[in-house]
Amino acid sequence: MAEQISSARAEARTVRIAPRKARLVVDLIRGKSVAEALAILKFTPKAASPIVEKVLRSAVANAEHNYDLESANLYVSEAYVNEGATLKRFRPRAKGSASPIMKRTSHVVVVVSELND
């Protein structure tokens, strides 16, 4: 008998937001139900909120479409942000020198699982 899959995941790779800033948003939704997590993200005034919301909605859609899971029974079991590639730029400074600018990118991962009743 095949084992029932009870979780689905979604990723957004190389998103142009610093991982440190994205982690502040991801920490708010970890362990919450999907409906509660979406409500939190909607009213969080951070640049990472729409990005994380899009990944969460994608994970829910993957769960419904690929594994026939009910969205009402889902919760955010894992949510984390890893560091992506860093774009290195330089800002001209006084006396012909330059200062480095690190434009950091993130890999956002959200895993939703079914609640075990």
Swiss-Prot record:
Entry superkingdom: Bacteria
Keyword Hydrolase attached: no
Pfam families linked to this entry: Ribosomal_L22
InterPro entries cross-referenced by the UniProt entry: Ribosomal_uL22 (IPR001063), Ribosomal_uL22_bac/chlpt-type (IPR005727), Ribosomal_uL22_bac/org-type (IPR047867), Ribosomal_uL22_CS (IPR018260), Ribosomal_uL22_sf (IPR036394)
GO terms assigned for molecular function: rRNA binding; structural constituent of ribosome
Keyword list, A-Z: Ribonucleoprotein, Ribosomal protein, RNA-binding, rRNA-binding
Any single Gene Ontology cellular-component annotation: cytosolic large ribosomal subunit
Gene Ontology BP terms: translation
Database matches in PROSITE patterns: RIBOSOMAL_L22 (PS00464)
Similarity section: Belongs to the universal ribosomal protein uL22 family.
Stated role: This protein binds specifically to 23S rRNA; its binding is stimulated by other ribosomal proteins, e.g. L4, L17, and L20. It is important during the early stages of 50S assembly. It makes multiple contacts with different domains of the 23S rRNA in the assembled 50S subunit and ribosome. The globular domain of the protein is located near the polypeptide exit tunnel on the outside of the subunit, while an extended beta-hairpin is found that lines the wall of the exit tunnel in the center of the 70S ribosome.
Known partners and oligomeric status: Part of the 50S ribosomal subunit.
Name of the protein this chain belongs to: Large ribosomal subunit protein uL22
Annotated gene: rplV
